[in-house]
């Protein structure tokens, strides 16, 4: 899947509102808590246990969420530079090989959780646009993971 120039421009234009505030920490945390609520078996893969409500105060998870949001922002900023975009995400995917049993099949549900978190933060979020953007970003990362 490829994005049009208009889609790239729209993603870049909307990113500041999506990431506004605390650098994405709350958005990332919300993404993970939604993900774990819907996919409780994934808590073990990420090294967590217990109730998802308790994770809202977990500094490790907060930091991981903030890093993911930062990386999405980096990817969005590189969307119009295909080779840089692909190289950055391919490398990130390869790095994820060292984090345990991470599989490409985990990313669609994580994307759903991210879109829900974004939608609760940004009034009028273009979910179709962001679903396409996430798909392109995650596909590039998965290519690195599976290489």
From Swiss-Prot:
Residues the record lists as binding heme b: 96
Molecular function terms, GO-annotated: heme binding; metal ion binding; oxygen binding; oxygen carrier activity
Keyword Heme among record annotations: yes
Record protein name field: Globin, polymeric component P3
InterPro entries reported for this sequence: Globin (IPR000971), Globin-like_OT (IPR050532), Globin-like_sf (IPR009050), Globin/Proto (IPR012292), Mb-like_M (IPR044399)
Zinc in keyword set: no
Subunit relationships: Polymer.
Domain Globin: 2-146
Pfam family, one: Globin
PANTHER family according to UniProt: BLR2807 PROTEIN (PTHR46458), GEO09476P1 (PTHR46458:SF1)
The entry's keywords: Heme, Iron, Metal-binding, Oxygen transport, Transport
Other information: This protein is one of at least six components in the polymeric fraction of Glycera hemoglobin.
Entry's family note: Belongs to the globin family.
Organism: Glycera dibranchiata (Bloodworm)
